[in-house]
Amino acid sequence: LGVKNIVCIPHLGASTPESEENCARMAAAQLRDYLETGTIRNSVNMPEIVLSGQPEGCRILLIHGNVPNMVSSISAAISREGININNMINKSLKEMAVTVMELSQVPTEELIAELSAQPGIIKVRYWR
């Protein structure tokens, strides 16, 4: 480019067969982690949440708007069912948030439906 004090280098990305294979492995591992535990890594539109193993009871993941009183309304619905929240993570990225709760027991389908119907909640998932 001929610009003083600038050294241009190419962005290689996944431009070699080896790097393409490595990127595919990494993407597959990240998808597996999300499906098995709820871990979110390297997302451009979700906060990073790293979870390990399986909880003793049940793990529930909620994707929702990053708005006031959301976590309170979620935990109120869960407590009305007599379910204890053993552990909780809530992280946000701009206007989106993710809440992961480890519950003392598996939620009923009615509770999942109630949570899914709350304004601002985009997705509800749980693992046993």
Task: Specify the residue positions occupied by each region the protein language model found.
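A conserved regulatory-domain signal marking ACT and ACT-like small-molecule sensing domains
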Residues: 41-128
